[in-house]
A protein has these predicted regions:
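Short, well-formed alpha-helical segments that are part of the catalytic scaffolds
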Residues: 1-13
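Hydrophobic helical membrane-anchoring modules
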Residues: 6-7, 165, 169-298
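Short helix-capping segments at alpha-helix termini
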Residues: 12-17, 40-44
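Short beta-strand/loop segment that forms part of the nucleotide-sugar
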Residues: 16-29, 49
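A conserved acidic beta->alpha catalytic loop
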Residues: 26-35, 83-84
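Acceptor/aglycone-binding surface of glycosyltransferases and processive sugar-polymer synthases
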Residues: 46, 50-52, 56-67, 87-161, ...
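Short beta-strand-to-loop acidic/aromatic patch adjacent to the donor-nucleotide binding site
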Residues: 72-84
């Protein structure tokens, strides 16, 4: 974290840095700080401490909600503290925001430095996301939010589960700028394979209503294909080209699979529609329950 603050001091444009405050969300870290923060050339550093670890997506939602209520500002930059979101790219986000004011600006990763295995599964994740939701996701958390959109965003319940997915779901205007992913300043990622899968699924779950309908449509199409295959099998049986017992067994098996697929898909759609009638978690209202304290460092 100290390395990141030092890079912010040196890499962020002076006219931006002079009016910048840093809010660090401490999601109940198990590691105590032993060294003080370095001198910050901006306005101040604040640490928002949470009662428990909720995961980085919910930490982002809480941090944004706190800023929206307590810290008047023109723009908010969301970034990870590991250095992979490079501070010098903040200048790029500000430049793009000046071109398209009123939109959330995301950093679209033009190049990544992770292992081949990670990059392979990341491509798989983007493909599955596109297939299930019909939308493309080419960005992560690194972004710039104008004040006007911040007030909209913290009232979007879906950002509690996944920040980028919540923005897509909310239909708040957003844009992207190609930025190369940086390298970690220190240490290694604590996210394991299971955590990465859960993170990917959480993004898809934000758009579960669209996903459920697309699965139902796919099930109906597959049912049509199965019925066509059954008709072909019955035709072969009628003309005597089918092995005795084979046609009946295959037809009944395909029919059972078709019915199960259709009913499960239909049940999923009804579950989603029922969920939409429930009262949802609104970060702007409920974030206070998780805030332990706020400390101003400098």
């Amino acid at each position: 974290l100290n390395l990141l603050i030092e890079k912010i001091n040196t890499d962020v444009a002076s006219e931006i840095l002079a009016t910048t405050s840093v809010l660090i969300v401490d999601d109940c870290s198990s590691i105590d700080r032993t060294t003080p923060f370095p001198a910050f050339k901006g306005k101040c550093i604040q640490v928002l401490r949470l009662y428990r670890n909720l995961g980085h997506q919910r930490a982002i939602a809480i941090g944004l909600s706190y800023i929206a209520e307590k810290l008047p500002c023109d723009k908010v930059v969301v970034m990870d503290a590991d250095g992979e979101d490079a501070p010098n790219d903040i200048n790029t986000l500000f430049a793009r925001s000046a071109q398209v004011p009123g939109k959330i600006i995301f950093a679209e990763r033009s190049k990544r430095h992770e292992s081949f295995l990670f990059r392979f599964f990341y491509v798989v994740y983007k493909s599955v996301f596109k297939l299930l939701t019909g939308k493309a996701i080419t960005f992560g958390n690194f972004s710039l939010i104008p004040q006007r959109r911040l007030q909209n965003l913290v009232r979007v319940s879906e950002i509690w589960n996944n920040y980028p997915g919540g923005v897509i779901r909310s239909r708040i205007p957003y844009d992207g700028v190609a930025i190369e992913r940086g390298k970690r300043l220190a240490g290694s990622s604590k996210m394991n394979f299971v955590s990465l899968i859960l993170h990917g699924l959480s993004a898809i779950s934000v758009l579960i209503d669209t996903t459920a309908v697309r699965i139902l449509i796919s099930s109906i199409i597959m049912s049509g294909v199965v019925l066509a295959v059954i008709c072909i099998i019955l035709f072969l049986k009628l003309i005597g080209n089918a092995t005795p017992g084979w046609a009946s067994m295959l037809s009944s098996t395909l029919l059972i699979v078709m019915m199960q697929s259709f009913l499960i898909s239909l049940f999923m759609v009804f579950m989603v529609l029922q969920y939409r009638t429930q009262q949802h978690f609104i970060p702007a209202i409920h974030y206070r329950d998780f805030v332990e304290s706020v400390e101003t460092i400098a």
